[in-house]
Amino acid sequence: MGLELIKEINQLWGPVYPYLARHIEELYGRREGTAIEIGPFAGVIFSLIEEGIGDRFVIASFPFGMGAFFIEQAKEAGATGKIEVVDTDPSLSGIEEKSVDLAVFRGAFFFPSLFDADLAAVYRVLKPGGLAFVGGGFGKYTPDSVISHLGKRSRDLNLQLGKVEISEQVLRRQIGESRIPVHAEVIDEGGLWVVIKK
């Protein structure tokens, strides 16, 4: 299933995470709460911890086999006692309803051969007043120098994993099909993202 490729992408993207965390913090607008990062492309959560954005941290890990990698990443980041790794699936089984203030799901719509993003599940786990940042890209604050440094290798790895490009129109259709009962804003600054506020 390409777990080694996914792990390489996650490590390659390390320099992006602090800038992406800044973008997320700007949208989230607070510093407390439970933060969860969903899926195989988790990593920005370590920058959220460093920046003090949130007071409880969870990685909802899938596909199976990525959890051990994230536990090792937490050790390397000195965050072992601060982060909980939960083996789950795109439906977020094992994650309680209305338990999350901030949800981040990178790579959500671009890897249909690996998983289908479940926006209804993301919405389900958000607390009232919670925010989800779902999609993909470098975020609006990542400098061009960082992007150009990892761009080609990241592109190659993504293609090997079956990455597809989707348009904003297709994304809007997917949002409609998810039947989440709130307005979801699509932003294209620094990637293609869906911002869900509950």
Residue ranges and their predicted role:
Residues 160-179:
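Short alpha-helix
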Residues 133-158:
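Conserved class I S-adenosyl-L-methionine
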Residues 36-37, 41-92:
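Class I SAM-dependent methyltransferase SAM/SAH-binding core
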Residues 12-33:
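Conserved alpha-helix/loop element of class I SAM-dependent methyltransferases that forms part
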Residues 116-131:
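A short glycine-rich, Lys/Arg-flanked "PGG" loop and its adjoining helix->strand segment in the class I
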Residues 101-116:
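A short SAM/SAH-binding and catalytic strip from SAM-dependent methyltransferases
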Residues 91-103:
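A short acidic, Gly/Pro-enriched loop at the edge of an enzyme's catalytic core
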Residues 174-198:
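Core SAM-dependent methyltransferase catalytic element
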